[in-house]
């Protein structure tokens, strides 16, 4: 059946029907900064929506490549964005369930001959109809170890990425330099990953905002002086090894809460007000080892 060139579809109506803006608004609300990442997600959502409308009018085109690569440091929102991406894919009908399964090498690779295939296939079975997020994916490939079984897991993933791409989306994640090397060593994998999104590190000011949000969610607050101390802490921590962006800020806040509790406990019989219980004072942060160096 031919369709007239005058046949119309309503882009805005379909966009609203699928409630894509709702997911994008959640992304804006849940993640501070990351403007380049949010822009890429919106671009992908637009492509998927237009492709869906083309299909409604019988226009021929291959399904857009949906497998993705998220690169960046720990704590930059990769898992959160993967969750939102799974939701978008579900709302637009590209996956059946829209759930996210997060795994690492240990979930896929066995320790002896014959162990890897069943492990990998079991994970894939759970992920079908949704999105499989493989964190630190480069650990799957260990070229220096001939007895490593990671290559077997990669081969199974390759087959599924090609043969069942209409029922599963795979997102590979990790540090950018290591992921680049991983793709160079596995060209078959690289050719099947169409969307590469780089997650920048947060600025100190963005991390301060994130820290304040984390505290507000737990009904704590910072004084003006405490805000300045936390900002100083973040700037110092960023220069230290194993800095993990929002995760490092969360750890700092957890320790500050513990110091606050001990400070009040050690004060003896003092009657505490609600303000005492919710306020993180500068001293609760200044006792960090970073300020003693």
From Swiss-Prot:
Residue sites binding ATP per the record: 72-79
Localization (cell): Plastid, Chloroplast
Entries under SUPFAM superfamilies matching the protein: P-loop containing nucleoside triphosphate hydrolases
Main location: plastid
SMART domains according to UniProt: AAA
GO CC terms, sorted: chloroplast
UniProt GO molecular function: ATP binding; ATP hydrolysis activity
Record key words, sorted: ATP-binding, Chloroplast, Nucleotide-binding, Plastid
Family matches, as Pfam families: AAA (PF00004), AAA_lid_6 (PF17866)
InterPro entries tied to this protein: AAA+_ATPase, AAA_lid_6, ATPase_AAA_core, CbxX/CfqX_mono, CbxX/CfxQ, CbxX/CfxQ_RuBisCO_ESX, P-loop_NTPase
Family assignment from sequence similarity: Belongs to the CbxX/CfxQ family.
Function: Necessary for the expression of RuBisCO.
Protein name, UniProt field: Protein CfxQ homolog
Gene source species: Guillardia theta
Lineage: Eukaryota, Cryptophyceae, Pyrenomonadales, Geminigeraceae, Guillardia
